[in-house]
Amino acid sequence: MRSSIKYYFDEETVLESLVFPIFAESNDEHKAMPYPSNKQELLAAMADGYAKLNEQIAKMSEEAISTPFDFAADPKKCGVRWQYDRCLRDLLIHLYEWQVLMREFVNNIREGHPRDYLPDEYRKNYHEMDKMLVEKHQSTPLEEAKRLLQETHEKMLRLAESFTEEELFTKGYYKNTYTTDMAAYFVSVTSSPYGQAVKLLKTHQKNLKTAKSKIQRS
């Protein structure tokens, strides 16, 4: 595990909030995951995170899928990254759109005209971008959201595979990754948010169960 997360983003502050909650924290519900230290571990973490997300989705009842998220009782359970997601579709689309952004970031570097990871208009307030990404997909069906995420996840795996170990894990190897490495960017749009999404869905299902118990007791 990395000794510090303080160097991540201004662009670097964003990575701090996106990459490390799953890797740096440990509690009774979720043991801290070792941060990938090589390409094989990175690819395994990406694949494992996606598999666990799908396992959690498969456990959801129709009621859990159709009932909007409600974290009003404990907003911290939701976190700022997911504050605009109101259902499973929103959550999956959110993941998909951040992976699209990652592909564009890498493609721009490889085509010789690199730019910062975040679009200029959202560099100081990326939460507004989160809101925009979710809002533009309000007519997207859930099954389409699942398909889009599956496609872009597979592209993320192939994209990560195309990098060498040095390119992935050398801090500052690419100018536009600043003081961190390319692997952290892959983590920030795959394994880390996959784990956060699983926790969010578990909390949603727990909230539904608690609400039903209160109704039954009343």
What are the functions of these language-model segments?
Residues R2-S26, A72-E128, E167, K171-S218:
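Short, contiguous alpha-helical
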Residues Y7-F9, L18-V19, F23-A58:
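Extreme N-terminal tail/first-helix region
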Residues N27-P34, K76-C78, M129-H137:
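A short small-residue
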Residues S37-D48, G79-W82, G112-P114, S139-T140, ...:
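Solvent-exposed interaction patches of small proteins and small membrane subunits
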Residues Q40-A47, L92, Y96, E143-K146, ...:
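Short amphipathic alpha-helical segments with heptad-repeat character
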Residues Y50-S61, Q99-R103, N107, Q150-T164, ...:
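Structural signal for well-ordered, non-membrane alpha-helices
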Residues K59-C78:
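Short secondary-structure junction/hinge motifs that connect adjacent elements
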Residues N125-T170:
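Acidic/histidine-rich alpha-helical segments that form the ligand environment
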